[in-house]
A protein has these predicted regions:
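Conserved phosphate-binding loops in N-terminal lobes of ATP-dependent enzymes
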Residues: 1, 95-206, 346-362, 383-390
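Nucleotide/phosphate-binding catalytic cleft detector across ATP-hydrolyzing
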Residues: 1-52, 153-266
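Early-domain small/polar-rich strand-loop-helix modules and first-structured segments
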Residues: 1-160, 306-320
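Gly/Thr-rich phosphate-binding beta-strand-loop-beta motif of the actin/hexokinase/Hsp70
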Residues: 43-73, 255-291
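Conserved A3 ("GATE") glycine/threonine-rich loop of ANL adenylate-forming enzymes
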Residues: 59-61, 246-249, 275, 299, ...
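Amphipathic alpha-helical scaffolding segments
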Residues: 63-85, 180, 184-186, 202-204, ...
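Metal-dependent phosphodiester-processing active-site neighborhood
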Residues: 73, 285-324
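Helical "lid/coupling" subdomains associated with nucleotide-phosphate turnover
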Residues: 238-242, 322-398
Length: 398
């Protein structure tokens, strides 16, 4: 991979005149055979607009939002920014071929928010002191869920899940890779809209379930990722990067995004993939907040991992889901990969539609009833915990 200061005008094509097997043939021993011209890069008029960017780094999914000047926040899409030197055609197979070719780089399609929090390692790692995006790790954007599940057994280029909670030093490095690429692609979208780097500010959320040391490490890694993603050491990261707990962030979403009036008494509960984040308010005053590690993974993913046949029942006659189920069966002896595969599947639109339409049909059967009861028990436990906190606040006359 090479980073250029401007869009290239052409690519020189050369071939090895003598067969060297699988070994690399140096440039001077190759024969130049022609040029491939690139289309002109689009010219963008710079503006003085400001973008406030919010990045929600989630256990299962991550989201990117932006607020331009004083407008309401919007979800940010990563558009297809590949500058192809040829017309990929309109045939479905040709388009699919191009999309598969770019899986290991930047997708040649629109990537909406949220997208799954997954990294992939490369076979041939290009090491760099600053862990630059795309070199040895890149964000694995899930396109076809079946292809993604089929990629799980590949130990040479493993898919990395649970980045948010990996306490190892290598895990923090992977967070930096993920964040740096997210910042880079966000900056590209801003530039395409005429917004300059110096007019960007970044906001990140984190769970209060993090320890103090983990929080410090997360902030340090994330700030470094901003500088790397922007390729700008002069960017005033300390001034232009803010952090807020997920409990407060979700409360602000309800108060401002959903325009819920925070008068009298309000309890917010945000149940995510890895944590449930809670806050209690009275007359717009924050009384209490917390997060704990009881959430979606602990219920749905764990249950399906131990009761795989329920996926088949929910899938009905959907060929894609049934084939995905068979692939999951082939890796069921590896509990970690199986759980990751189920996470991929349940986050697919196909499974979401099947679950919505068919779960009510399977709740009369043993496994379906168990999952429903477990879900109700978990939610009841969260609400019981909240009620205990509320009672304590009342007794303490807070």
């Amino acid at each position: 991979l090479r980073s250029l200061k401007s869009s290239p005008e052409a690519i020189m094509c050369n071939v090895a005149t003598q067969s060297g097997g699988k070994s690399y043939t140096e440039h001077e021993k190759r024969l130049d055979v022609g040029l491939i011209l690139f289309p002109d890069a689009n010219q963008v008029q710079e503006t003085s607009n400001q973008w406030a960017v919010g990045i929600d780094f989630g256990t299962t999914n991550s989201c990117v939002y932006f607020k331009e000047n004083k407008e309401n926040p919007k979800e940010l899409e990563f558009k297809n920014r590949i500058n192809l030197p040829y017309d990929p055609g309109t045939d479905e197979e040709e388009i699919e071929e191009v999309m598969q070719a770019h899986k290991e780089f930047v997708p040649s399609r629109i990537v909406p928010s949220p997208f799954m929090t997954i990294l992939r390692e490369r076979n041939y790692k290009e090491s760099s002191a600053e862990n630059l995006p795309f070199r040895s790790n890149f964000i694995y954007y899930v396109d076809q869920v079946l292809y993604a599940i089929q990629d799980l057994p590949d130990d040479k280029r493993p898919l990395k899940f649970n980045l948010k909670w990996d306490e190892a030093e290598q895990g923090r490095t992977k967070v930096q890779y993920f964040m740096a690429q997210t910042v880079l692609q966000t900056a590209v979208e801003a530039a395409a809209n005429g917004v300059k780097r110096e007019n960007l500010t970044f906001n990140f959320s984190y769970p209060e379930a993090y320890t103090a040391n983990f929080t410090t490490s997360f902030k340090k890694v994330t700030r470094r990722a901003v500088n790397i993603g922007l390729a700008d050491e002069n960017y005033k990261t300390l001034e232009k990067t803010r952090f807020e707990t997920e409990s407060i962030s979700s409360a602000l979403y309800f108060a401002k995004g959903q325009e819920v009036p925070f008068v009298n008494n309000v309890v917010t509960i945000d149940i995510g993939g890895g944590t449930s984040d809670l806050s209690i308010w009275q007359d717009t005053k924050l009384l209490w907040r917390n997060s704990f590690r009881l959430a979606g993974k602990d219920v749905l993913i764990n249950y399906l991992t131990n009761n795989l046949t329920l996926i088949k029942e929910i899938s009905g006659n959907d060929d894609l889901l049934l084939e995905s189920y068979q692939t999951l069966q082939s890796i069921r002896t590896n509990k970690s990969k199986l759980a990751n595969g189920i996470e991929l599947l349940v986050n697919s639109p196909q499974f979401g539609e099947a679950f919505k339409n068919r779960f009510s049909m399977v709740t009369g059967k043993e496994k379906g009833k168990e999952l429903r009861d477990l879900t109700e028990l978990t939610l009841s436990g969260i609400l019981y915990y909240v009620s205990q906190v509320v009672n304590h606040l009342i007794e303490s006359r807070v």
